[in-house]
């Protein structure tokens, strides 16, 4: 199959537990559980927007495949397996 590679968001599990955005505690628990199951906390975004993954984000942060919320930490957006792009948190 050809096309755009699926972006993979990788966030260390201890950083997921320290999210400081507006996630409901149940949503945060689901993310932690998902991260525990998935190898190295890889989240397959596919066609999801960040708003769909983080339902508590303000409207100005609802941009596709962008992760912008008040967390000073590290994360990477992988396009395929070759490019590793660090994400900036603002």
From Swiss-Prot:
This is Uncharacterized protein TP_0955.
